[in-house]
Amino acid sequence: GGYGTREAYEILERICAAGLIDYVDLDVAIEPDQFWLGMPPVFVEPHVYRPYAEAVRKAAGKVPVLCVLGRLTSIADGEAAIASGVCDVVGAARALIAEPSLVKNAFEGNEERSRTCIACNWCLHSMLDDGAQTCTINPVSYRERLWDPEKLVPAPQPAKVTVVGGG
């Protein structure tokens, strides 16, 4: 049962036209056996949800749209989505887990310093496994208090180390 996307867009159009909401927050519902698509992994093309965002933008009229495009990895991607008119605000959870300073770095003209989410979905798996969200790219994720840079002190003696299998 239920209703499909066509009906959802019609309902949204009527609600927006009536002035009943201030903004639309687009998220994507998924089937239980495809929960992983809620956070598109590396083998799913970037911005997989853009067609839904475009349809919501059309139905919403002038009501602002916040959307999740799927695998947004850079400020440039978000700016392009906003500039194209597909949305007014973009969501980027994994990009900010991988690099909490992503927006700050972009404002300062240092986006190249930002770590990029590789969509491996370790953040999702770690949360499901033990409730502690961790990140392959950002080892400090979920451990911010333990990795306080002001608490780190240099080793008393320099050491030579060899990294084997660093990839």
Residue ranges and their predicted role:
Residues G1-G166:
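Flavin-dependent oxidoreductase catalytic cores
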